[in-house]
């Protein structure tokens, strides 16, 4: 059982009452977390019990409420690592398929499984250069070998890859993609998807709407064409390119660049960072260029552009100080 602290993202029974969750979920929460619980602890318990039908809603709530928190990326990485740990013995080799409790046990000696109707599989692999094509819903996949590839079209799947140079291609909605290895490549066209990458030199391409994208290490490159995206790039020497409308882009690493041709909702720069933002003056498209440390642009502060294309600092509610 985990008791929340001020440093951790947490959830309480009062939060669940405000969300009007189902009776079964509320009772489950009271049983395991009567005093509230941290994001990591609650997520781990859901994974342990294979409560896949609740995981996506829980993650959506956490992202909507806490994505902009300074500690979010660190806690999200902890959650990703817990998924890998909870799926079984780390020393186990090969491919493991595990059915949920209400299914019959499948043979585990086969390296390839084909399915047209089985959903909610638990799949773990530590082999190298493994390719997986997934079309079911509510599955949990964890790959830890190098140069693995995951292709997914199913909804509400949890896709984790910790190996070097892993590739994930996703078209399913409401999925979650986690990549902890360096030089990974992620391509997504699904909507309402959460993408987290913590390796160096990752490339992420997104065209889905209402997605959350986090890249926490250096030399990341993120390209987004989807509307209503929230992008958080914290590594140094990174680049975020956006063409979607009503997006929020944060490139808080040192010497990083934000380029946007879409109708940008907010932007934020790090030390030595710069932003190139397009706007229409009524006759043609023009560009405004902003540099951290010049014209009042402060690292770590979110800005939006007023009708004259001047940057205005966005002050969060409940803020006690203004820079």
Each language-model region and where it sits:
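Short, glycine-biased loop/turn motifs at secondary-structure junctions and
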Residues: 1-323
């Amino acid at each position: 059982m985990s008791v929340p602290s001020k440093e951790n993202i947490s959830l309480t029974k009062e939060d669940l009452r405000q969300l009007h969750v189902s009776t079964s979920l509320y009772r489950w929460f009271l049983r395991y977390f009567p005093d509230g619980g941290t994001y990591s602890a609650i997520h781990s318990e859901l994974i342990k019990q294979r409560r896949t039908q609740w995981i996506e809603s829980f993650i959506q709530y956490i992202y909507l409420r806490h994505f902009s928190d300074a500690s979010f990326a660190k806690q999200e990485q902890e959650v990703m690592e817990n998924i890998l740990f909870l799926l079984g013995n780390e020393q186990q080799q090969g491919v493991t398929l595990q059915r949920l409790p209400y299914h019959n046990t499948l043979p585990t000696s086969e390296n390839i499984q084909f399915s047209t109707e089985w959903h909610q599989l638990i799949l773990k692999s530590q082999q190298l250069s493994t390719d997986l094509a997934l079309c079911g819903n509510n599955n949990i996949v964890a790959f830890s070998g190098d140069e693995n590839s995951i292709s997914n079209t199913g909804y509400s799947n949890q896709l984790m890859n910790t190996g070097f140079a892993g590739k994930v291609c996703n078209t399913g909605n409401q999925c979650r993609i986690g990549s902890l290895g360096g030089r990974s490549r992620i391509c997504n066209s699904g909507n309402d998807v959460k993408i987290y990458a913590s390796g160096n030199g990752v490339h992420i391409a997104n065209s889905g709407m209402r997605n959350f994208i986090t890249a926490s290490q250096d030399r990341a490159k993120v390209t987004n064409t989807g509307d209503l995206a929230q992008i958080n790039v914290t590594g140094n020497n990174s680049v975020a390119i956006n063409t979607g409308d009503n997006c929020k882009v944060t490139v808080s690493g040192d010497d990083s660049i934000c380029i946007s041709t879409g109708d940008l909702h907010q932007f934020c720069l790090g030390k030595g960072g710069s932003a190139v933002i397009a706007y229409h003056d009524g006759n043609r498209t023009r560009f405004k260029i902003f540099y951290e440390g010049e014209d009042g642009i402060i690292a770590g502060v979110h800005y939006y552009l007023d009708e004259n294309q001047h940057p205005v600092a966005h002050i969060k509610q409940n803020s006690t100080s203004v820079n």
